[in-house]
Amino acid sequence: MGRKCNNNDYLREQYSKYIKLNKNTINICEGNYARIVSDNNSKLLGVCLRGTDYLLYHHPMQPQIEVVVKEAKKYFKLLNCDYYYIATEDYALLKSFEKYLPKEKIITYNAGNVRQVDGLIGEQIRKDKSATDAALDYLTTLYILNKCSVLIGGKCRATIVASYRKNPPYEYVNIIDTHKSY
């Protein structure tokens, strides 16, 4: 059983089989997607980095933004993408991406909505929103990551779930594991 849980094809099959979004949730996610992507045929490159709020909790350390940007630029050009979809809750990370990538090519959904945090970012988000709204935002982020053709990012729950939830699989995926934790 342990080997199967590390197999993305197996996880993708299980996810598709057992985890289904209801029609209302799909409509909400699709509506949020349509608000940021004007052309449904646009080819997106998803970039996902989590914030650094887990310093005391031994979560995976995220790669340096320069490493992610270099890889993203390479595959954006190689695979003829139209937009970078940036998925991060961290305002400072979003601003860093805007320094390295052309702003007119960046799209986001609620990215950078946390500017200062004292504790966990998730706790901060839940102070500002209901649990339902926070969950719908997270599902929308995953939904849009699954609309992308490419996924590049640091090791975190969102990149891992997005990688095996996408069916068919991405044209290219790289979840960068620094093999370090905070």
Over which residues does each language-model region extend?
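Secretory-pathway luminal glycosyltransferase catalytic domains
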Residues: 1-81
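N-terminal cationic-hydrophobic initiation segments that often serve targeting/anchoring roles
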Residues: 37, 73-77, 98, 145, ...
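Hydrophobic beta-strand segments of well-ordered beta-sheets in folded domains
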Residues: 42-45, 82-84, 105-106, 148-151, ...
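Catalytic donor nucleotide-activated moiety binding site of glycosyltransferases and closely related
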Residues: 48-53, 79-130
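A short acidic (Asp/Glu
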Residues: 57-60, 94-100, 162-165
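Glycosyltransferase-associated regions of secretory-pathway enzymes
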Residues: 59, 121-126, 177-182
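Short, flexible loop segments at the rims of nucleotide/cofactor-binding pockets, characterized by
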Residues: 61-62, 127-133
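A donor-sugar binding/catalytic signature common to diverse glycosyltransferases
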Residues: 137-180
